[in-house]
Amino acid sequence: MRFYISTADLNAGISVIAKALPSRTAMPILEGIYAEAQGNNLLLRCNDLSLQIETLLPATVEKEGSLVFPGRLFLDLARRQPDEQTMIETDKTTVTMKSGRARATMQAFDAAEYHSMPFSRQEFFVNIKKNTLKSMIRQTIFATAQDETK
């Protein structure tokens, strides 16, 4: 896999999906970011077995493929890229990220091992006014757990 992507787009996409990136899990591959370069797009996906978030980003794809990047490390490196354009190249087990004079290489997982949640194509929308949603959250926030053990 080899593609070029705007560093700003990459950081925006990673920020969105990182919300589903688990900090601890019994399955190390779930601590990664699934990436698939196809056509003129890059699909990024994270899940913690209860929540899955995906985003599709525009990219210049030279070689299609998929791999699972190490989540937190990839997130930190992407945020520190110095140039406007980032090039990411992979082989079966490594990822190389280049931007300007910066270059980083890291180990990766095989995409076939990644556990994706089934995606339902049913469309269901609810429109709620912003103030109504804020009020609903304020009235229920007291009941949320402070940590994951409860």
Please tell me what each predicted stretch does:
Residues M1-K150:
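Structural preference for solvent-exposed beta-strand-turn elements
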